[in-house]
Amino acid sequence: MRATNLTLLTDLYELTMMQGYFKNPTNQTVIFDMFYRVNPCGGSFAITAGLEQMIEYIENLHFETEDIDYLRSLNIFEEDFLEYLSTFRFTGDIYAIPEGTVVFPREPLVKVIAPIMEAQLVETAILNIINHQSLIATKAARVCYAARGDGIMEFGLRRAQGPDAGIYGARAAVIGGCAGTSNVLTGQMFNVPVLGTHAHSWIMSFPDEYTAFKTYAKMYPNSCTLLVDTYDVLKSGVPNAIRVFEEMREEGIKLTHYGIRIDSGDLAYLSKEAYKMLAAAGFDDATISASSDLDEYLIDSLKTQDAKINSWGVGTNLITSSDNPAFGGVYKLAAVKDAGSSTFTPKIKLSENTEKVTNPGNKTVYRIYSKSTGKIKADLICMADEVFDPEETMIIFDPSDTSKKTKVLGGTYELRELLVPVIREGKLVYTSPEVMELREYCKKEQNTLWDESRRLVNPQKVYVDLSQKLYDIKKNLLEEMSEKALD
């Protein structure tokens, strides 16, 4: 947690492969792509996150004396290799899609160009960092979409799978759209709003509910949200909250950020009845917050039922992405450049499952926007040296079905390259935005999606296609591999 050197945050086989390369030197430079194949939670997109922590990992990548001593104790690694590790630094290039960007399956989120030993070592940590935060940012985006503009508070720390998942999950949740977090350490580390009310234990520690409410309101008159379901929401909690609000008003205390929170029961019914009671007392502007094992589906249902809730505390199902607890990012070799060569040789991984056949070569990703609407038409994976003129018509190819291709008419679209340089020759060339800036950027990104692609259930797919050049390279490699298999 908050570690600066995570060099041993790797799988053992990365190190054993490194030693193999060291003992059998080829001096190859390679390209690895980090991408995913299936959108989380049945959606049509993901939100990429974790780049800042990935950069910190790369910048602090080095083996301490105690790391070398530990590796020596495993009786696997030879002394000359351990000596090499003692001076190891990352010297390659990394390109990445910025955090908060809407992304789709099979397009590279991160591209690593480096000597093969360096590129191999960083695989595990890159996947660990990007997979986790992208998952939670995506879940948060879905939850926020379901809330239809209401504020979402991230409340999941106590249910997260450990401190790091709580800290960085909360960071990712804010990038995905949450207004803030209950996690104070995340607030301190990333300068994001920290939010919270009080627990049932606060109410229970006082002789009665009214006294508990009154004491809390006196202490926090400018941020007074009272938890009303400790005993009985409508017979006790809301009446006592109204009594306290009335007394504060009579005392000349201006109520600004105030309201109630309901943490159990029929949230639709209780919120409607509570609103009637608050409105009758002149507090129709009070916030009604809800918690209680919420997720995007329940929030969407409550909004459809016209529940009088305008603030939501979401914990377990957000911080764990409970219905889809893993982001399936992978890290695959795409090209190799031998010592003395000036060009990369494309590499392809085959599979009986066409979805798992990789896209070869040194690639980049362009987003194609409709010029008239600003919405995404498709994403295009192409070779890194390709140049396109938006005034010219372009043919793009479905990566799985060779019979499907799309014509994009010149003059009707705009292009944006998504992969940006982050590390060059081991040196940082990228400035990470603040988390709240990423949150605003992420909102704008999601607005480039068609409404049909933002549906929580059965959304319209956004297509990721290949350029003619990449399509031809992939087709030729597949044919070569098929011929070799027949020999």
Per-region residue spans from a language model:
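Glycine-rich phosphate/ribose-binding loops and adjacent secondary-structure elements
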Residues: 201-381
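Ordered alpha/beta subdomains of enzyme catalytic regions
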Residues: 1-222, 249-250, 256, 332-487
